[in-house]
Amino acid sequence: MGSFGVRSLVHLTSFGPQFADLLNYPPLSVYSNGKALPVRQFLRENPERYAPHFILQFHKGAALKFQDQSYTAPVANKIILSWDVLNSELPLDHGYFEYAKKNHATALLISGVSGIQQEENLDAKLKEIARLLEGFSQETMVYCECGPFFLKDGYGKYFKELGGKSDIIACSDEELFEINGVSHSSFGGNPYMLMDLLDKFFHTYHPRRGVVIHSRDVSMYYGNPLPEGRDVKSALAMGNMVASAKARYSDYGTREMVFSIADQPDSTVGLQRIKTLEKGGVIAVPTKPVEHPACTIGLGDSFTAGFLSCV
């Protein structure tokens, strides 16, 4: 969000010298002891607390070797190696939430719990986050996404605890299938199945407004209307463009990068699927797919940034 000019305040769990360049955008600040500090100042004033995740990206047909065994990747995907204690414990600064309330934040994104790998840690942390979400005014949109994928039923626990305290809950289409116990291979592009899963997701976890789903060909919103002045269709379109910019340039995306995507053709699959989805009350926008992407990591995060910048 900082890279394309949206003023944002972040809560950092892990940080070190590597963050100085990655997050050094004027609109972006870091919360520290009741203040919003520029990233470099925050890093100067706080001792390093660095705990990286390693993400290995590979293409369809790639040979993957683990010790004496070899596999051929059937699809492009990635392997996430997370070994640190810090992100699994996820220490939270409660002052960040109070600062957001006091300053009437337009939106509050709840994410980053995906590093939690112990069930007892997850249960305690979700209860803590739920308490911290109490007392926000209606002008702050609480957006909850990216569940704890290392744990069995992690997504279910996550949305069960936080769904009712959120305006919007969000995930990818693959996560939607997993949450509902449905095999992605059984989907076959069936928009009616997609509508059933959206409806089940919405009515199981009871967000105050609705659910957002992003996928390769179409992004979707299903639920109650958003407050006046919040245009969900524009937000979905912006999310799609920011994700495509990340795929094309392997970068967070300046305004110029993002808007260079605007003239790209819409997904033909998405255009076909939308006709049926809209009849079922789903607001849907086709994506702008990038052939031969330079990067496939963090596209969901980029979509979220684009969506929140407009809504």
Predicted regions and their residues:
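Conserved single-residue anchors adjacent to enzymatic active/cofactor-binding motifs
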Residues: 300
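Catalytic tyrosine of NAD(P)H-dependent dehydrogenase/reductases that use a Tyr as the general acid/base
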Residues: 297
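Ribokinase/PfkB-type carbohydrate-kinase core domain
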Residues: 2-294, 311
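Active-site-proximal C-terminal subdomain of hydrolase catalytic domains
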Residues: 307
